[in-house]
């Protein structure tokens, strides 16, 4: 068997003929030519037999490694004039538009990025992280289910931080599938407006319920004409409990600042170490943390009252209570919090009273962001695993290829290219 024939079978790329093979010190260079007589625009479906000029464009792509050798595919491409996109270098069937990697290589990297950290990927495939990010963006652009916004009846909208410094992504999930179906940079009304704009009025009107946090931005967007005006707004109990936890943290900080002014600085340091004992659920406490809580209870004061309020609010949603029971307990909590004299909890009570209907709707319909929050926890793991991103688009792409509706097909799982 000739070397060119062997490499043709090993490459398993469609629409090419191998014309030359060059074994170099650290890589194998395979020169190919396209078999098709028609030139295809890389941006659209337009094709033509006519060349724009006789100039050839030398191009190369990184392919899957051949053992320890890098494998590079080279070809001289032709140029065409597309009526829509103007003069372009012809597209190739084995690589995505604008890429210097073959589709097989990118599909492998895209799958690896869902399971491995940055350092491991760089070592295995021998490309820098910025290149990995751009590969993932291309995999997302071509691999996401094009019908992911169809039959979207119950969804959740939430924001997640992708980088320190108030850098956020808004993510929309389908509660029925447990997958992210849309995402964009930002967390304001205009960001969610973009989602409804892409969804269109007809599909937006089909949404029956949408869960979100208790901020005003997402609700304002959902209630705009042409958006989800008929959907029931459900304020997620997770965020209600989170509001109580954040209020407790504000009280703790205030008390800690007061203790720092005392002559005994050791007391302030010991008190600062009580943070996790206060924030964790009672069932998750260590023995030392339980002992810390007992000391705080004996001491009493604002901090213990704040902790008791936080736990009272958490307990309302810890069980499977009916809507009327939750409503009664929320009213009781709000009354207690309003009389507490603790400003952060007074604010929480005001917010709950204002959002009461949406909170109870979430309980009544069983619609909440619990599954979405589970996705958000996985998002944070993804972000930590990647050690940062060069752009919001890169972060969003990795999130979507990992947690979105995409079917990863590895090169060996794809149907083999038939020999000519």
Q: For the regions a protein language model found, what residue spans apply to each?
A:
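Tryptophan-centered motif/residue detector
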Residues: 58-61, 93-97, 129, 182, ...
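Short, flexible, mixed-charge glycine/proline-rich loop motifs
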Residues: 28-38, 69-76
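Long C-terminal interaction/binding lobes of large macromolecular proteins
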Residues: 1-29, 34-36, 102-104, 124-236, ...
């Amino acid at each position: 068997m000739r070397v060119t024939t062997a490499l043709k079978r090993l490459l398993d790329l469609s629409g090419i003929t191998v014309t030359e093979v060059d074994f170099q010190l650290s890589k194998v260079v395979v020169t190919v030519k396209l078999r098709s007589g028609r030139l295809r625009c890389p941006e659209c479906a337009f094709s033509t037999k006519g060349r724009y000029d006789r100039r050839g464009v030398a191009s190369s792509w990184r392919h899957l490694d051949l053992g320890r050798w890098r494998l590079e595919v080279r070809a001289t491409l032709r140029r065409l004039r597309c009526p829509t996109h103007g003069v372009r270098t012809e597209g190739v069937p084995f690589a995505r538009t604008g890429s210097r990697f073959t589709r097989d290589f990118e599909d492998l990297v895209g799958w690896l990025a869902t399971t491995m950290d940055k350092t491991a990927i760089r070592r295995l495939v021998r490309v820098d992280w910025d290149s990995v990010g751009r590969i993932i963006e291309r995999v997302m652009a071509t691999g996401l289910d094009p019908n992911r916004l169809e039959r979207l009846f119950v969804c959740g909208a939430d924001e997640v931080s992708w980088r320190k410094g108030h850098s956020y992504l808004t993510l929309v999930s389908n509660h029925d599938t447990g997958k992210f179906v849309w995402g964009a940079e930002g967390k304001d009304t205009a960001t969610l407006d973009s989602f409804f704009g892409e969804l269109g009025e007809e599909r937006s009107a089909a949404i029956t319920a949408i869960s979100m946090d208790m901020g005003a931005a997402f609700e304002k967007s959902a209630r705009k004409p042409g958006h989800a005006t008929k959907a029931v707004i459900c304020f997620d109990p997770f965020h209600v409990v989170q509001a109580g936890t954040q209020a407790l943290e504000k009280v703790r900080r205030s008390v800690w600042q007061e203790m720092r002014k005392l002559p005994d600085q050791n007391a302030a340091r010991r008190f600062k170490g009580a943070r996790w004992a206060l924030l964790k659920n009672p069932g998750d406490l260590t023995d030392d943390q339980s002992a810390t809580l007992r000391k705080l209870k004996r001491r009493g004061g604002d901090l213990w009252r704040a902790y008791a309020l936080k736990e009272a609010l958490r307990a309302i949603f810890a069980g499977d209570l009916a809507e009327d029971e939750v409503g009664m307990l929320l009213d009781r909590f709000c009354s207690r919090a309003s009389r507490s004299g603790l400003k952060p909890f007074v604010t929480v009570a005001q917010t709950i009273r204002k959002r009461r209907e949406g909170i109870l709707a979430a309980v009544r319909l069983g619609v909440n962001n619990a599954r979405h929050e589970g996705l958000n926890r996985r998002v944070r793991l993804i972000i930590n695993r990647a050690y940062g991103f060069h752009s919001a688009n890169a972060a969003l792409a990795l999130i979507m290829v990992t947690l979105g509706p995409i079917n990863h097909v590895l090169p060996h799982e794809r149907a083999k290219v038939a020999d000519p």
